[in-house]
Amino acid sequence: MDNFKYIYRILKILEKSMDLEEFDMELIGYKELDISKPRWSRIVSMLKEQEYIQGIDVWYSLDQDYPRVKLVRPEITLNGLEYLNENSMMKKVYNAA
């Protein structure tokens, strides 16, 4: 269940950042979210794959068992906004955290 909390939190932060001229990418980093780098990389990779976020580079390498992720200019997409709006379960989890 924590994975959905992290997904919602990342999307919510990116949604709020739409009003900002500059965005501090550390706000959605694994240290700020207090999760492992492998879990964070997999979550961010899934968010990009599902087209909930953009401005992220994801690739795989032989020396690492999880995806490598580079935050270039992360932004929430229309799909991500719809996910936030439609997913009431995530709202409940986010508010309970």
Which residues does each PLM region occupy?
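Short amphipathic alpha-helical interface segments
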Residues: M1-E32
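Generic structural signal for hydrophobic core residues of well-folded globular domains
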Residues: L14-S17, L47, L84-N87
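Short, solvent-exposed secondary-structure capping/transition elements
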Residues: E22-F23, I56, K92-A96
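Short amphipathic alpha-helical interaction segments
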Residues: L33-Q50, Q54-D57, K70-L71
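Short, amphipathic alpha-helical interaction segments positioned at domain boundaries
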Residues: L62-A97
